[in-house]
Amino acid sequence: MNDAPEFQPYGLPHLTVIFITIVLPFVLAGLVRRTQSQRIEKLIIAVLSSVLILNYLAYLIFIRSQGTMDWRQMLPMQMCDWGIVVVIVAMWTGRQRWFEVAYFWGIGGTLQAVLTPNLRYGFPDWRFISFFTSHCGIIIGVVFLMLTRRYRPYPMSIVRGWLWSEFYFVVTLIVDKVTGFNYGFLLHKPEAFSVLSFLSDSWPLYLTQLHGVALLFFLVLYAPFAVFDAAKRGFVGKTGKQEATL
């Protein structure tokens, strides 16, 4: 374990992972569109779901076999753990409301983990592979749904996503207090540099600021769709006025 390579932020392996995360959902969605096959789409969903589940189970088996963590550190209480469940449910049920949560958690939370990972070990260590398989798999699943099923967030999506996030915060904070582990980084900031590094070291002020950051991310993630909707309404209104004058 001690001879594992050290993770280098934005080194070649990290950049390769980011590139694959960006490109792969477009490739998969392009395959579905070209074939117009529901069987292909279901197969892709099955593969993505299986990879996410098997990777998580393999991670638990490996860390348990190494004896590096006890049960309190192995609970499925990280946001990406919940994100795995949500994105799998969204892919299989095809329900907009599950997608909304997967979108805000997957793009807002998991994307931060991909860009600024709290990770000590580099490629080809299994912890590097497992970490990015789970986090990138969530993002790939979310973007795949957006491209193939035209899913997108709406104004009320922010409210529903926020309520689900508050539920996660409450449950996870209780677990953190009981176990003493920092699930969801609710007790203190992660070691790796990230947006959370700018928050206060004082708790519970840090937790309050964390809520503000989460809400800001939600608004930023919805902003492109709000701009598109506003531009579309303006275009339609302008076209209607022109037709009325003819």
Locate each region found by the language model:
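Cytoplasmic-side transmembrane-helix entry/capping segments in multi-pass membrane proteins
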Residues: 41-47, 74-78, 99-107, 131
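Structural signature of hydrophobic alpha-helical transmembrane segments
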Residues: 14-20, 67-80, 100-103
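Hydrophobic cores of alpha-helical transmembrane segments in multi-pass inner/ER membrane proteins
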Residues: 17-29, 81-92, 136-148, 209-225
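Membrane-interface transmembrane-helix boundary segments in multi-pass integral membrane proteins
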Residues: 4-22, 161-163, 167, 179-218
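Aromatic-anchored segments of alpha-helical transmembrane domains
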Residues: 51-61, 106-118, 165-174
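Membrane-interface helix caps and helix-loop-helix hairpins in membrane proteins
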Residues: 64-71, 92-97, 117-129
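Membrane-interface helix-boundary motifs at transmembrane edges
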Residues: 32-45, 92-98, 149-158
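A contiguous pocket-lining binding segment that forms or flanks enzyme active sites
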Residues: 115-168
